[in-house]
Amino acid sequence: MIRADGRRPDELRQVTILRGWQEHAEGSALISAGRTRVLCAASVTTGVPRWRKGSGLGWVTAEYSMLPRATDTRNDRESVRGRISGRTHEISRLIGRSLRACIDLKALGENTIAIDCDVLLADGGTRTAAITGAYVALVDAARWLGRPDAIITSVSAVSVGVVKGEAMLDLAYSEDSTADTDMNVVCTGADGFVEVQGTAEGTPFDRTMLDSLLDLAVRGCAQLTAIQTEALRGPVPAGPPRPGGAR
C-alpha cells in the first residue's frame, strides 16, 4: 500500500535536525519530520528543586507547547486561557521521563536542565518529534556544562498505527486522525523501551498486530538514532558563555 504522501508503510517521513538553532540556549535543535517542526531548547541552571537538594543528583525536566498557528486553525495560547490542558501536561511529563532515561543524574551533579519543546508546525507526531529533537539539545547542554559523560544512551520516539488494516510507521495527521490504532513508542539506542502508549480507536488489535507495530517502531527508532548521531557529529555550537566565562 502506497500512502498519500508516497511513502511505503514502513517508511519514516524525511527527518532533519539542525543544532544550535536558538543561540541563547545551552543546547538547541530544530527537528523537522515531514511537515511537523518542533524547536527544542535546553537551559542549564545551577542547583536543583528544593526536594532534590543535598542528594547529589541532578534533574531534567521538560515543557511542551504549541504555537497558536501550528495547526490549520488558530488556538489560543494556554497562558491566555489561564490553564494548561491535560494533554500538554501529559506530553510534558512524557518528554521529561524519556530524557531522564538517557542520563545519569548523579554524573550531572546538582544541576538542572530544562527542555522547552515548542511546536512550530503540527502535522502529526509532535510529541515523538519533540523527544527525538530534545535528546540532541540535551546532549549539547550536557557538553556545555562540561559533563558529556552524563549521557549514557540515546533516546528517540516514533508513532506507529493501524490504518485501513495495515501497520504503518510515523503517521502524518491525516493518517493519525483516521487510524484504527495509534501508538507512540520511545526507545533507547540499545533497543530498550522507555514508554509504549497505544490505543485502539475502534477495532481492538491482537498480539500479532502489536508485535508488528513494535517491530516497526524499533526499526524507525534505529533510523532516528542514526540521524541524531549524525547531527551530533559536528562541532558543538558556541551558545552562551560557559561556566567560568570561557566559550
UniProtKB/Swiss-Prot annotation:
It catalyses: tRNA(n+1) + phosphate = tRNA(n) + a ribonucleoside 5'-diphosphate. Coiled coil: none annotated. It is an enzyme of class 2 (transferase). Phosphate binds at R87, G125, T126, R127. Signal peptide: none annotated. It holds the Pfam family RNase_PH_C. Its EC number is 2.7.7.56. It comes from the Bacteria. GO terms for molecular function: 3'-5'-RNA exonuclease activity; tRNA binding; tRNA nucleotidyltransferase activity. One of its GO terms (biological process) is tRNA processing. Keywords: Nucleotidyltransferase, RNA-binding, rRNA processing, Transferase, tRNA processing, tRNA-binding. InterPro entries: ExoRNase_PH_dom1, ExoRNase_PH_dom2, ExoRNase_PH_dom2_sf, PNPase/RNase_PH_dom_sf, Ribosomal_Su5_D2-typ_SF, RNase_PH, RNase_PH_bac-type. Homohexameric ring arranged as a trimer of dimers. Belongs to the RNase PH family. Phosphorolytic 3'-5' exoribonuclease that plays an important role in tRNA 3'-end maturation. Removes nucleotide residues following the 3'-CCA terminus of tRNAs; can also add nucleotides to the ends of RNA molecules by using nucleoside diphosphates as substrates, but this may not be physiologically important. Probably plays a role in initiation of 16S rRNA degradation (leading to ribosome degradation) during starvation. This is Ribonuclease PH. It comes from Frankia casuarinae (strain DSM 45818 / CECT 9043 / HFP020203 / CcI3). The lineage of its organism: Bacteria, Bacillati, Actinomycetota, Actinomycetes, Frankiales. The gene is rph.
